[in-house]
């Protein structure tokens, strides 16, 4: 069973007019970013001077989890609520990407996390572009 199969089997409200392919890509990107940010936060929390990075990664992981869970409930989907959540996820992912990118050359964990954040922000932007007006 894939998430995509489950999504197609679920009753939809506003989500019926939404691009489920973009939604699935966004769910997958949020999941990958959640994992990368959680691991980066754990790695950076024990390093001197990396408290801001660890905190930013933890915040990004929390936002990605909320975004992912929201999209996994399509029956209660409301584009007017989804839009600001996607915008918030994009903003947090971009901020985390900037923070991790600033130490990417000294930390492979940060480099990979920055890439996951960039992918997530892009997937959220693609999902945002599909929402009905």
Where are these regions (language model features)?
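Amphipathic alpha-helical hairpins
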Residues: 1-133
